[in-house]
Amino acid sequence: MSLALKQKIITKCAELDIPLVGFAPARRWDEPLFEPWIPEEFRPQSIFPETRTVIVIGLPVSLPILETAPSIYYHELYRTVNTHLDVSGYRISLILNSLQLPSIWIPRDGYGSISILKERPLAFFSHRHAAFLAGLGNFGINNMLLTEKYGPRVRFASIFTAADIPPDPVIQNPLCTSCMLCVNSCPVKALDGRKYPKGLTDKKACAIRSEALSKRYISPCGLCIKVCPVGGDRKLYAREDMRMYTGDSMEYEKYHKAWKHVRSYGGR
């Protein structure tokens, strides 16, 4: 295993303004940590048999922009983050290939449209589980991957490589506080309040909601990740008082006015 290669990738991620990167050996997918586990056909070596290590990169979505969701503002942020992730993942795979280490990039999404997700709510690879196995965080009741720096407000992409790279440890202590803000804020009741994986998102309900917002040019929804109290980004933006989202305090009226203003333009 090459510590030098690992550091080279971490340095490259810093150059690409990617704040989160983690490494997981492909064998971790064959060692179930909970049930139900990842089916064999969704594991890295079933997709790219040469895989020895999965590199996961993560980019945050800015909390103050997310707070306007659903809106054209968050819609554009989501698109921008996704594009940056895909380009960066592809570039990292090219660097590894140039070192004679067979590697491929896995895009952040693996579906053509929301209508497809309504029929079959699965992608061919789960970046959330990859991020979990690469030590970037663990699951919350909202079924999202919670990270220490950004809570669930992160998008992920992955690189499969034939290189043996020293792994990062899986985070054992749960980050989710079981506050239920995500459950209570979901407009389609897609979360049942049980901890993952016993409690699973109603993906069809979520997809129907996303499709409706997409027709108005203001998808995705984002409410369950907006209200999550976990993440160092809350301290950065002085968003640690969760009452600001309930409307119970006049102290935060200026924020609600700002969000309403943004939501009033650019979509239907």
Stretch-by-stretch model annotation:
Residues 37, 74-75, 80-260:
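Catalytic cores of enzyme domains
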Residues 1-10, 15, 31, 41, ...:
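N-terminal and secondary-structure boundary signal
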Residues 1-78:
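Non-catalytic, usually N-terminal nucleic-acid engagement modules in DNA/RNA processing proteins
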